[in-house]
């Protein structure tokens, strides 16, 4: 799952879902992406700033698509999909300052970092 953080302030977005799963064996979200004041197109034309996990998730989706292009289309790893993509994204997640325990219930494994996700 994807949570949101404020990339300008390098802080957790308080509206973002957080916590342990019902079994208390997993922490969610898995990682976070920018989700505060994201510039996007507005209905009716023009641009606006939007906030929410609905604006954080496309960052992770785009990162996964680029990884799959690199692996599958360009022939670097023909089996780069699903859990393997998730594993690489989590492994490369960056930690925000001020948090001592990783993963944690606010930020999961950390913030999205596509650059460090590829092997």
Predicted segments — roles?
Residues 1-65, 116:
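Extracellular S/T/G-rich loop segment that most often corresponds to the catalytic His/Ser-adjacent loop
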Residues 100-119:
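C-terminal domain-closing interface element
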Residues 35-102:
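Hydrolase catalytic cores
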């Amino acid at each position: 799952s994807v949570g949101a953080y404020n990339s300008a302030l390098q802080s957790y977005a308080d509206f973002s879902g957080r916590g342990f799963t019902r079994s208390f064996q997993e922490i969610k979200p898995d990682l976070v992406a920018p989700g505060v004041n994201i510039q996007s197109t507005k209905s009716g034309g023009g641009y606006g700033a939007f906030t929410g996990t609905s604006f954080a998730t496309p960052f992770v989706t785009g990162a996964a698509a680029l990884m799959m292009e690199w692996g599958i289309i360009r022939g670097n790893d023909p089996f780069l999909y699903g859990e393997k993509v998730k594993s690489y994204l989590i492994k490369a997640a960056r930690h925000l300052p001020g948090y001592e325990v990783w993963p944690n219930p606010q930020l999961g494994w950390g913030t999205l970092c596509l650059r460090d996700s590829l092997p």
